[in-house]
């Protein structure tokens, strides 16, 4: 497919290291096959130059709906190995946080829908994620109580 570079604009993915390989239309969802690859960095442990090792099993990253169907990105991340200290490292992207599989844009959409007072099961169904993910995002919010005034009517039970 010659137009795969337009997918980054369509999905608003700004990471230049993600290369899209193919799009598969399943019966229930769309799968975008991509790989994350860049030059080997220096080792964060010993400082020597790491080498490209292989790719991880694809991460199944849920993404926003496209053309009315749930979309997920099957992202193969490059692994790097330091031959000096034998440590391994996985390529990182701005699409998702380190050691996470829910993209930042989905987390923003969850927060937006929680503010709109949509039920958690509806949010999970609309974004093709689990209800527990929505609950975890709700627990990330910090609610402040305003104790600067008292209510007009107060009652005590004796």
Language-model-derived ranges and their functions:
Residues 60-158:
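Short, positively charged, Gly/Tyr-enriched micro-motifs
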Residues 1-87, 93:
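Short, conserved DNA-binding cores of transcription-related domains
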């Amino acid at each position: 497919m010659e137009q795969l570079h337009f997918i980054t604009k369509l999905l608003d993915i700004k990471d230049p290291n993600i290369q899209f390989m193919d799009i598969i239309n399943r019966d229930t969802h769309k799968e975008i096959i991509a790989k994350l690859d860049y030059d080997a960095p220096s080792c964060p442990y010993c400082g020597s130059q790491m080498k490209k090792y292989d790719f991880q099993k694809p991460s199944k990253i849920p993404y926003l709906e496209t053309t009315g169907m749930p979309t997920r990105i099957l992202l193969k991340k490059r692994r790097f190995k330091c031959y000096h200290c034998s440590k391994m490292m996985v390529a990182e992207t701005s699409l998702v946080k380190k050691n996470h599989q829910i993209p930042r844009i989905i987390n923003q959409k969850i927060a937006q829908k929680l503010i709109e007072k949509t039920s958690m099961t509806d949010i999970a169904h609309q974004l093709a994620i689990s209800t527990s993910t929505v609950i975890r995002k709700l627990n990330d919010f910090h609610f402040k109580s305003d104790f600067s005034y008292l209510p007009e009517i107060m009652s005590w039970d004796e």
